[in-house]
């Protein structure tokens, strides 16, 4: 008998799968080299097309020149640098009027890591997480690797707000979290205030009925680029 592979097949399949977004990005790069990037409209990866604010660059240069190397390049506390968490909490409280403190802030290397931690925190294997179509395809592996199951609520095709009829039908006792993404990738839709209020009311009602909290996880990488 030959040697048996000890690699996890499910993970191998995930890594070998093709990403349409990456394929589009590679095609856009190739076309840009052929006809000039200014002639290519690239709707694949969400890379910014505007320069970094000068204030940010100046601050980074200042820190590199004045901070101790270990402070900049050494290990940070597990929850993140305290002063950074304090600054974020202060900013959120100022902007949204909610009593955030540093104890409410957990730093992660990007939204993917933060979502993965959140899913692991609120689910056990076999639990369900609901999200709404259309959705960012990477949600599937983030949830799958926890042992939970991602269930997708079909869209309201008229306006891509939440399809509440389908949502309430799928919101069973097995659901431990609901994942929203607004502004939405890929539709660009922003959930209205009435939509979000109705969603919150339903989750409160069902949490009470089922005897456990149904968490609302909000993925907001595009929150700052909402244009009127």
Go through the PLM ranges and name each one.
Residues 7-110:
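N-terminal small-domain helix-loop-helix segment of the aminotransferase-like
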Residues 1-5:
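Short, Lys/Arg-enriched N-terminal segments with co-localized hydrophobic residues
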Residues 46-49, 221-225:
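Short, internal active-site loops enriched in acidic
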Residues 70-211, 217, 223-228:
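Conserved core of the PLP fold type I
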């Amino acid at each position: 008998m030959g040697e048996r592979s000890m690699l996890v097949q499910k993970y191998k399949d995930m890594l070998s799968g093709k990403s349409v977004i990456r394929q589009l990005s590679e095609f856009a790069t190739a076309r840009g080299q052929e006809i000039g990037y200014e002639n290519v409209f690239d709707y694949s990866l969400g890379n910014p097309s505007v320069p970094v604010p000068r204030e940010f660059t100046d601050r980074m240069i200042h820190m590199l020149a004045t901070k101790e190397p270990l402070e900049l390049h050494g290990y940070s506390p597990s929850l993140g640098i305290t002063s950074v968490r304090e600054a974020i909490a202060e900013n959120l409280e100022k902007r949204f009027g909610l009593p955030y403190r540093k104890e409410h802030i957990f730093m992660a290397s990007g939204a993917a890591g933060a979502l993965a931690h959140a899913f692991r925190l609120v689910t056990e294997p076999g639990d369900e997480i609901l999200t709404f179509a259309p959705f960012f395809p990477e949600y599937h592996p983030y949830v799958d690797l926890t042992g939970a199951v991602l269930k997708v609520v079909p869209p309201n095709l008229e306006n891509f707000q939440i399809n509440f009829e389908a949502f309430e039908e799928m919101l069973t006792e097995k659901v431990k979290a609901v994942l929203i993404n607004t502004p939405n990738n890929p539709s660009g839709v922003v959930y209205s205030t009435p939509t979000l209020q109705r969603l919150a009311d339903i989750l409160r009602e069902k949490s009470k009925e089922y005897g456990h909290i149904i968490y609302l996880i909000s993925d907001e990488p595009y929150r700052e680029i909402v244009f009127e």
